[in-house]
Amino acid sequence: LQFTAALAQRLTAEGAELWLDTTARRLLGGPAGVEGVETSRGIIDADAVVVAAGSYSPALTRRFGLRLPIEPVKGYSVSIPLHGIEGAPGMSIIDDARKVVVTRLGEQLRIAGKAEITGFDLRLDERRWRAVREQGLSRFPRLAEQLADAPSQPWAGLRPMTCDGPPILGPTPISGLHLATGVGHLGWTFAAGSARLVADQLEERTCDLDPAPYSLQRYG
């Protein structure tokens, strides 16, 4: 939250206009390419548009005949308040055997994991999120005892997975349309680097990173 708040402050100071709580309904344009976006707050005219809509990116690009090899993969997280309890890990821990991640976020513990191919179904399966909680706490038996009666806040989200793993970053065959999507479960990890790579290509600057492995053209 602190990072995103600081980033928003920096962007607005540089002249960016942030439209929060706004839905991007469809891309606008025609044979010449993309010319803007229709949103729940009105139309934005643009010479270039970056689609960074995660699992919903294919729905936006389909109108221009561009089919993206991205599928939603559902994951769960469970947040548990600590209320001053000691013994919680001070850094993120990945349990590769159980496929869960345990992270302390201030005064709460967040456990995330699972991978379900269920389309865009975001319903919370209690069996699944309780399994995530149990698996995450199993490495910390004393902490598990202390949190046995603590409330849980479950959540489910969709990871935009490409068919080969890496994200899709950069221009498309459609004039004015660029992509920053398909980051899978590494959205936060890849965010800043993806933005830099896409921005460099938009501005036709030399990229510090070879863009070819992330280009849509790799699919032929």
Swiss-Prot record:
Q: Which cofactor does it need?
A: FAD
Q: Which GO terms describe its biological process?
A: D-alanine catabolic process
Q: Which Pfam families match?
A: DAO
Keyword list, A-Z: FAD, Flavoprotein, Oxidoreductase
Q: Specify the superkingdom.
A: Bacteria
Q: Does the keyword Transmembrane apply?
A: no
Reply yes or no: does the keyword Oxidoreductase apply: yes
Task: Tell me a GO cellular component.
Answer: cytoplasm
What would you give as a GO molecular function for this chain, any one?
D-amino-acid dehydrogenase activity
The text of the family note is: Belongs to the DadA oxidoreductase family.
Name it.
Uncharacterized oxidoreductase in pyp 5'region
